[in-house]
Amino acid sequence: MLLPWATSAPGLAWGPLVLGLFGLLAASQPQAVPPYASENQTCRDQEKEYYEPQHRICCSRCPPGTYVSAKCSRIRDTVCATCAENSYNEHWNYLTICQLCRPCDPVMGLEEIAPCTSKRKTQCRCQPGMFCAAWALECTHCELLSDCPPGTEAELKDEVGKGNNHCVPCKAGHFQNTSSPSARCQPHTRCENQGLVEAAPGTAQSDTTCKNPLEPLPPEMSGTMLMLAVLLPLAFFLLLATVFSCIWKSHPSLCRKLGSLLKRRPQGEGPNPVAGSWEPPKAHPYFPDLVQPLLPISGDVSPVSTGLPAAPVLEAGVPQQQSPLDLTREPQLEPGEQSQVAHGTNGIHVTGGSMTITGNIYIYNGPVLGGPPGPGDLPATPEPPYPIPEEGDPGPPGLSTPHQEDGKAWHLAETEHCGATPSNRGPRNQFITHD
C-alpha cells in the first residue's frame, strides 16, 4: 500500500518535526530515582534497591565491599562506606557492619586456596586425601577418603573433595596391588618389549611376571614328596620320644638323680638358721661312728628339762692310752656288729676304732710340772752366771758368805720310858725349834 502524502514533499518536511515533538514529551515525564515512594512495597531493581518501611520509600543498597554508614530518608539516599581490613561484604547489602574474615581450620581438614578481601571471604577446601563430610552453605568439616582395595581404583570426579571415594574395578590389561585412596590402575608389563618371555600372566591384583628365555622352570613338588616332607619329621619325633621313655623306665635312678639336682641349693646359699627346720645328718649305714655328730641326741635327757643342775659327768671307765700292740690284739668288729651310742647316756664311748663323746667337755690349759716342755710352752729363762745378792744388802755385789740368823734358843726334848730314872733314860730325840 502506497502513502502518497508521506512521500510527497510536504510529508517529508513534517516528519522530523513530529518525531522531535514525541521526544520532548517523553523527556518531560519524571524518572523514579531513589529514594522514591512505592505504593505496593516493591522496588524496580530488587538486587540493588530495598524497601524502607518507615518512610515507605525505596532506597539504594550498598555495593560489595561496603556497608551502610547512614540510612536513607525522603530527601537523601543511602550513604555507604568501605569495609575495614580483615572484614568483608560479598553482596549488595544494607548492613550496618561488615563480616569478619575467618581462616581455614586445619584441624577440621581445611586448607586455604584464596585469601580474604573486602568483597570476598576466605576460600577454603578439603586437604588432599580428604572429602567434605559436613556441608552448610560451605564445607565445615573434612574426613579421610576410604581406601580402594587391590584390583580397584577411585572413580574420578569433577569436583575434588565433594564426596567419598567410589571404587571401580580396573580395566582389562591393568592392575592395582595396594590399598590406597589415591592409587590408580597401571597397565600390565609387556615382557616381549623387554626381550623376556612371560612366566605368569597378570591379573587385576598383580603384574605380569617375566623371565629369561634360557631360564628353566622350577620343578613342581608332587603330592608324595610333600607328604614325605611332613611325615618324616613327625616319625622321627615319635621315635625319639619312644626311645627316651624306654630309657627312663629302665633306669629309674635317672629320675632320682634329676630330682636331687633340682632340689640342690645353689652354691653360696646356706640353710636358714631362723627357719628351725634343720636336722642333723643321718648316720652312714656302714660307718655309723665316722659320721655320728658330736651333738646331743633327741632322746637324751637334758639338764634343763629335768630341772637338775648341770654338772660335767665322765664315765669311770675312761680308757687309758693303749699301745699299738694292744690295739692289734683287740677283736675287729664287723660292720653289722657296730652299734650306735645308746640314747640317754653321757661319757666317752670307743667303738670300732672311733671315739664318740657325749656330754660336756672341760679342757684344762695349765702348766705341767716335772715333765718335758710341750710344743706350746714358753721357753725357760736361763740361769744367770753370777750370784744374785739378797734384797736389802748394802754391800757391793759379789760373793757372799752364808751365816746363821739370830733366833730363839735351842731346846732338847726328852723321851721318858716307863720305870726309868732321869739318869738311865734312853737315847734322846732332839727337836730343834727356832724362836
Curated annotation (Swiss-Prot):
Topological relation to the membrane, as annotated: Single-pass type I membrane protein
Feature: compositional bias, Basic and acidic residues: 403-417
TNFR-Cys repeats: 42-81, 82-124, 125-168, 169-211
Signal peptide: 1-30
Cytoplasmic topological segments: 249-435
Comp. bias intervals (Polar residues): 421-435
Record key words, sorted: Apoptosis, Disulfide bond, Glycoprotein, Host-virus interaction, Membrane, Phosphoprotein, Receptor, Repeat, Signal, Transmembrane, Transmembrane helix
Domain of life, per lineage: Eukaryota
UniProt feature, compositional bias: Pro residues: 373-399
Any Pfam family hit: TNFR_c6
Cross-referenced SMART domains: TNFR
GO terms for cellular component: Golgi apparatus; plasma membrane
Cell compartments where the protein resides: Membrane
Region described as Disordered: 373-435
Transmembrane segments: 228-248
GO MF terms held by the record: identical protein binding; ubiquitin protein ligase binding
Covalent S-S links between cysteines: C43-C58, C59-C72, C62-C80, C83-C98, C101-C116, C104-C124, C126-C132, C139-C148, C142-C167, C170-C185
Stored CDD domains: TNFRSF3
PROSITE patterns in alphabetical order: TNFR_NGFR_1, TNFR_NGFR_2
Segments on the Extracellular side according to the record's topology features: 31-227
GO biological process: apoptotic process; cellular response to mechanical stimulus; hematopoietic or lymphoid organ development; immune response; myeloid dendritic cell differentiation; positive regulation of canonical NF-kappaB signal transduction; positive regulation of extrinsic apoptotic signaling pathway; positive regulation of JNK cascade
PTM annotation (Phosphoserine): residues: S323
Function text: Receptor for the heterotrimeric lymphotoxin containing LTA and LTB, and for TNFS14/LIGHT. Activates NF-kappa-B signaling pathway upon stimulation with lymphotoxin (LTA(1)-LTB(2)). Promotes apoptosis via TRAF3 and TRAF5. May play a role in the development of lymphoid organs.
Protein name (record): Tumor necrosis factor receptor superfamily member 3
Gene: LTBR
